């Protein structure tokens, strides 16, 4: 997962691509959990928080 400073230095397009990638990861993790093949359930929380970070930075950049 990327640090907040790394995310702030990214452009809006890069952030949107990062968000799309995180959403795909989140979906895949949820499907694995539903099928019972996910051992590391903490990854779901990590990805969810990363999505929130990216969305927050996108909102900050939109306000400027």
From Swiss-Prot:
UniProt keyword annotations, A-Z: Ribonucleoprotein, Ribosomal protein
One Gene Ontology cellular component annotation held by this UniProt entry: cytosolic large ribosomal subunit
GO MF annotation terms: structural constituent of ribosome
Keyword Ribonucleoprotein among record annotations: yes
InterPro entries: Ribosomal_protein_uL29 (IPR050063), Ribosomal_uL29 (IPR001854), Ribosomal_uL29_sf (IPR036049)
Keyword Ribonucleoprotein: yes
Biological process, per Gene Ontology: translation
Source species, domain of life: Bacteria
SUPFAM superfamilies (alphabetical): Ribosomal protein L29 (L29p)
One Pfam family of this chain: Ribosomal_L29
HAMAP family the UniProt entry points to: Ribosomal_uL29 (MF_00374)
NCBIfam families to which the protein is assigned, alphabetical: L29 (TIGR00012)
Annotated family: Belongs to the universal ribosomal protein uL29 family.
UniProt-recorded name of the protein: Large ribosomal subunit protein uL29
Organism: Legionella pneumophila subsp. pneumophila (strain Philadelphia 1 / ATCC 33152 / DSM 7513)
């Amino acid at each position: 997962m990327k640090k907040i400073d790394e995310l702030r230095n990214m452009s809006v397009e890069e952030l949107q691509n990062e968000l799309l990638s995180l959403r795909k990861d989140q979906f895949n993790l949820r499907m694995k959990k539903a099928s019972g093949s996910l051992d590391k359930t903490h990854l779901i929380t990590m990805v969810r928080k990363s999505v929130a970070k990216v969305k927050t930075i996108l909102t900050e950049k939109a306000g400027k």
